[in-house]
């Protein structure tokens, strides 16, 4: 009996040590609390996707508002976006000129949100090379058959955050902009940390920073570059109060409340922790894309070994969470998925398939 008791105590001590180490790594790198979440979502729901037939070149990042589908289309020679009518499948036109003119740009970011001003549909576009923001009047552009830019806002970024560029941008209201600031490589082994920022729209002033991580991680032996350790896909809650971040290399989502500043991480039970980035461990790919409405978060999930640079993985699992981090449903689609966009007008999740 003494021998059995001794083995039992050793096993318990080993488990406690592992748990302490995991909490140490979490607290060392993550700026909030982390809750373990169990998979109580029940059976996987099989979903049959309905085809949307479009007549014309439809490539790139998608965005959808009601009957309008937008593509940030790299195959367009002179414009960045083309728009289709979902009801008819017909192409409405091409918009947002490429070039060096006053209302043109060398590159544009994808659409993150739509809003209306005096019942006219508009969106915010970021031109990084020109350091400008464009307010694109979509309603008038479609009516006139040409790009209508209501407002151009100078928005210098190169000297703002040590050379780190903005990525996702979201208008919280008429005067406040929420922005994701991407990591910036400092050397082959180290990069800056991504964070979120609250800024004024018209005067380009930083009001508050929201840090997700406490410190960078150095690991020359890791199979991925330093700025990819904490890689993620993000989606803002439509009411502008929160953002969800799904991690590319951990089975974890992080929810930041812009009103309270509270940051919570939700990690799948049994999932890897931050120690996976140390040494020569096998780093997997987990979450790929994310979309959200005011009630739920839709995260495209892989959960397997990383794919090669020329491989096209068959990703067809969507995890549905609520805004409290609870996994409420797992969906499995009958086609593989590349990009997603949630239209909150018709309450439809649109997806594109990988281009082979």
Predicted features along the sequence, with ranges:
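Asp-box/WD-like beta-propeller blade repeats and closely related beta-sheet repeat scaffolds
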Residues: 129-175, 179-184
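Beta-propeller blade signature
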Residues: 83-85, 139-140, 191-203, 313-326
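Structural signature of eukaryotic scaffold interfaces centered on beta-propeller domains
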Residues: 58-65, 110-120, 165-174, 226-240, ...
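Conserved blade-ending motifs and adjacent loop-strand segments that build the rim/top face
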Residues: 96, 101-105, 270-279, 323-344
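A short helix->beta-strand "capping" segment at the edge of beta-propeller domains
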Residues: 30-57, 324-326
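Blade-loop segments of beta-propeller domains
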Residues: 90-124, 153-160, 222-225, 334-337
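Loop/turn-rich, solvent-exposed surfaces of beta-rich toroidal or solenoidal domains
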Residues: 280-319
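Beta-strand-rich domains and repeat architectures in extracellular enzymes and scaffolds
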Residues: 47-81, 298-301
